[in-house]
Curated annotation (Swiss-Prot):
Keywords: Ribonucleoprotein, Ribosomal protein, RNA-binding, rRNA-binding
Keyword RNA-binding: yes
Species: Pseudomonas fluorescens (strain SBW25)
GO biological process: translation
UniProt function note: One of the primary rRNA binding proteins, it binds directly to 16S rRNA where it helps nucleate assembly of the platform of the 30S subunit by binding and bridging several RNA helices of the 16S rRNA.
Molecular-function annotations in GO: rRNA binding; structural constituent of ribosome
Record's subunit section: Part of the 30S ribosomal subunit. Forms a bridge to the 50S subunit in the 70S ribosome, contacting the 23S rRNA.
Family: Belongs to the universal ribosomal protein uS15 family.
Descriptive protein name: Small ribosomal subunit protein uS15
Gene: rpsO
Chain segments annotated as transmembrane: none
Length: 89
């Protein structure tokens, strides 16, 4: 379920703040959201895969922590990001 190089590069290019930016909260949240969405499709076919479900829960928690950080740091960037990603927070 890992991202291939082209997918990751496209997501980074879409959400980066400056050229070469791969570590901003926006990029990290976008990558986590993409992985979470891919895993949700996996669970529709493999409902009993509890090992992967643990990884999914870990990703969701990491994304929530990053979103909480961004919300406290810059509310405008936070609102823009959740609007672009279609998250319901």
């Amino acid at each position: 379920m890992a991202l291939d190089v082209q997918e990751k590069a496209q997501i980074v290019a879409d959400y980066q703040q400056a050229v070469g930016d791969t570590g901003s909260p926006e990029v990290q949240v976008a990558l986590l959201t993409h992985n979470i969405n891919k895993l949700q499709g996996h669970f529709k076919a493999n409902g009993k895969d509890h090992h992967s479900r643990r990884g999914l829960i870990r990703m969701v928690n990491q994304r929530r922590k990053l979103l909480d950080y961004l919300k406290g740091k810059d509310l405008g960037r936070y609102q823009t990001l959740i609007g672009r990603l279609g998250l319901r927070r």
